[in-house]
Design a protein with these regions (language model features):
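Sec/Tat signal peptide C-region and signal peptidase I cleavage site
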Residues: 15-20
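Consensus positions within tandem repeat domains that build extended binding/scaffold surfaces
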Residues: 57, 77-82, 100-105, 123-128, ...
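Structural signature of tandem-repeat unit edges
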Residues: 30-37, 62-75, 85-98, 108-121, ...
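Sec-dependent N-terminal signal peptides
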Residues: 4-13
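Surface-exposed repetitive/solenoidal architectures
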Residues: 21-85, 102, 171, 220, ...
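A generic local structural motif
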Residues: 52-55, 302, 409-412
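Short, aromatic- and cysteine-enriched interfacial helices/patches
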Residues: 13, 44-45, 413
């Protein structure tokens, strides 16, 4: 039967145009031996554009425990060993110079692998979902680590990246739950989006001074990260870059940074210190405020539980205190005219907030999920309240509106707020507020404000 399969394989996969020829044999002990020269790329599903089809041993993949690639084979094809779920070891000769996309995807029992210094790149998704992989040796011949190369290698505890590597792709180590340490050399100039997303055991990381941008979501979900060093080579920090780094205690923004995108430090609930270095032309942390302020616009873009909003700030930016769940109270100075989208979203310990009479607009979801906020007073200066502003503020016991004209309400402003709580409004505006708030509160809840 095995000879018959081999004959079929030679008939289908002999590429005389390129002299490509691969021979394979699967022994009774589960050893797959591969010899020849150039291994083609494969696909789990037939690709009508390229003619690529599944590897000839794919139907036997669950029997494969060990792979021996003999010297002379120059490359490992795309998806060559995908879902070989019983594979525990592999021998790669130094004749191999390339490893194709998703070559070992889903090899969930593979524990260790040594990549020889003949290989120059680790391709996209090479070890994706290799859950048992605890050890991998990357040689100094490798210049790039592709996107998703080690995604969800949940047992991988440490990784040393050689100084030959210049780029780390998107999601390269995303979901490596056990990764506690990683060494990134100065040769690396780019680290892709979500490269370390969800590395919950990673406690510290130093970004080399060869990197100029911290990409979107790159350290998102690194909930064990206590310290991070941002070099003064960095000029921009992407959106949600440090989202949910919940035990990160301090952050220093070097004077080289000229761009910080929205929600960069959202849900960093453990932050107690935020400092912008002196001499930064774009941002400052004036008056030791423990916040990042965009200097020209006087917009506070990121704060922490110890932040004090200076009275020179005119707006609170998008997600400025998002997820700051240790914040219990905040005073907004009367210099502020707008509260941005999601500004205090998820501040689950916030019991009180004073909105000054200078504020004219409150952005979408500004106080969403402030689940212990007890009361709120909307001053007569406010003309618009965005979508879902008090959504899930189910601890509210009263709401007060001081304006004689109701502000413009977007959808779901008071969704999941107790409908029976009193809503106090100016006596001569009761009917107007009954109409404006009819979707949220019964008419009996709208009451005259007592002065």
């Amino acid at each position: 039967m095995r000879k018959y399969l081999l004959l079929i394989f030679f008939a289908l996969f002999s590429f005389s145009a390129t002299n490509a020829e691969i021979r394979w044999k699967l022994s009774d002990d589960g050893t797959l031996t591969i010899s020849g020269t150039d291994m083609p790329d494969y696909r789990i599903f037939y690709d009508t554009n390229t003619g690529q089809t599944i590897a000839p041993w794919y139907s036997e993949r669950e029997k494969i425990k060990k792979i021996v690639i003999e010297n002379g084979v120059t490359g490992i094809g795309q998806e060559a060993f995908t879902y070989c779920v019983s594979l525990t070891s592999i021998t790669i000769p130094n004749s191999v110079t390339s490893i194709g996309k998703f070559a070992f995807k889903g090899c969930s029992e593979l524990e260790s692998i040594t990549i020889l210094n003949s290989v120059t790149s680790i391709g996209e998704g090479t070890f994706y979902n290799c859950y048992a992989l605890t050890s991998v040796t990357i040689p100094n011949s490798v210049t790039s680590i592709g996107q998703e190369a080690f995604t969800h290698c949940e047992s991988l505890t440490s990784i040393t990246i050689p100084n030959s590597v210049t780029s780390i792709g998107d999601w390269a180590f995303g979901g490596c739950l056990s990764l506690t340490s990683v060494t990134i050399p100065n040769s690396v100039t780019s680290i892709g989006e979500s490269a370390f997303d969800g590395c919950k055991s990673l406690t510290s990381i130093t970004i080399p001074n060869s990197v100029t941008r911290i990409e979107d979501t790159v350290f998102s979900g690194c909930s064990g990260l206590t310290s991070i060093t941002i070099p003064n080579s960095v000029t921009s920090i992407g959106s949600i870059a440090f989202y949910d780094c919940s035990v990160l205690e301090s952050i220093t923004i070097p004077n080289s940074v000229t761009s910080i995108e929205r929600y960069a430090f959202s849900d960093c609930s453990g932050l107690t210190s935020i400092i912008v270095e002196e001499g930064n032309a774009k941002y400052d942390s004036r008056d030791n405020c423990n916040a990042i302020i965009e200097t020209k616009s006087n917009t506070l873009i990121a704060g922490c539980k110890n932040a004090v909003i200076p009275n020179t700030v005119t707006s609170i930016g998008h997600g400025a205190f998002d997820g700051c769940d240790s914040l219990t109270t905040i005073t907004i100075p009367n210099s502020v005219t707008s509260i941005g989208e999601g500004a205090f979203k998820g501040c689950e310990s916030l019991t009180s907030v004073t909105i000054p009479n200078s504020v004219t607009s409150i952005g979408d979801y500004a106080f969403y999920d402030c689940s212990v906020l007890e009361s709120i007073t909307i001053p007569n200066s406010v003309t618009s309240i965005g979508e879902g502003v008090f959504f899930n503020c189910y601890a509210l016991t009263s709401i007060t509106f001081e304006g004689s004209t109701p502000p413009r309400f977007e959808e779901d402003v008071f969704k999941d707020v107790n409908k029976s709580i009193p809503v106090y409004v100016p006596a001569n505006s009761i009917e107007a507020y009954k109409k404006a708030l009819g979707d949220y509160f019964p008419e009996t809840s709208i009451r005259a404000l007592q002065h």
